[in-house]
Amino acid sequence: MDEIPMPRVHILATGGTIAGSGASSVDPGYRSGVMGVSALVDGVVGLRSVAVLTGEQFSQVGSQDMNDGLWLSLAARVNALFAADEADGIVITHGTDTAEETGFFLHLVVKSDRPVVLTGSMRPASSLSPDGPLNLFNAVSVASDPGARDRGVIVALNDDLHSARDVTKSSTTDVQAFISPGAGLLGTASYGRIRYFRSPTHPHTSGSEFSVEGLVAMPRVDILYAHANMPADLVRASASLGAQGIVIAGMGNGNVSTDVANTLADVAGKGVIVVRSSRVSSGDVGRNIELDDDGFGFVASDQLNPQKSRVLLQLCLASGLGSGPIQDAFFRY
């Protein structure tokens, strides 16, 4: 009987806390991304028994320094690895600050049903009790699992599996720092033992209309945080500095003051796409609820938080969509 070959998993290391190091095992301060991919792999006992591993140091940054250029390069690399059949699954080690944004971007532009799994850690590798090694073990296990196919990009942290569409960071320091409000977990992974609870219900990866092939830059989209007595001149400043889109992290159901709403309507009339999201951690932003989106020319974000709304709006603008199709996209994705 022929032996079943081990799955091939390629690790793309981008830096982050999982590769961080501090002055001592109990020092809360540390530098992100100082460990290389080989040290990360060698630090996880039994990892090479899960899959045939290859790895590369894609970048060495804290995820606060992730940017559009790195996203485009990362998407191109993932798509190239799959197109060349060089991996059955890919793990991306990443800082937690912007993991949800990188994950959602890849969720919309990777053109394969093979698993892409983001992981990271809340504690640096030098910590007294680092969470990174087990997170990496679980992530490689998921990337090796045929059951992970066609579930889009998965974020694997602290034994939980999240869809990149739904996940958000909810704590600055807790090890249990990520939640998927409303939608809930995709599943769990405990010491490599995987259970799935559901599959994503919105289009993703090979089912997504979005592609960044040949794209060298992303449109500028700004996020403005709404608050009591918010000055409307922030809207004018954003538009004057070249933003093609503005996402409002609105109060409640995506609300803003009358003055801000009128100013947003003015820039929307001049071609800037305005998306209303919410600074609240869960719930939908409905269209034409308290604000007249039809009259103002706004887009309602539906279920996407401000940072995810920015990603989708960038891709919509890069695809040349107008406000009507962009609203449709927010309802679909």
Regions from the language model: what does each represent?
Residues 118-191:
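Internal gly/pro-rich beta-alpha loop/helix module
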Residues 12-14, 92-94, 117-120, 154-158, ...:
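Short beta-strand segments
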Residues 84-99, 241-253:
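Short acidic, glycine-rich surface-loop motifs adjacent to enzyme active sites
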Residues 92-114, 256-265:
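Short Gly/Thr/Asp-enriched flexible loops that form oxyanion-binding sites at enzyme active sites
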Residues 5-8, 12-16, 36-48, 163-245, ...:
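Accessory alpha-helical/coil subdomains and C-terminal extensions
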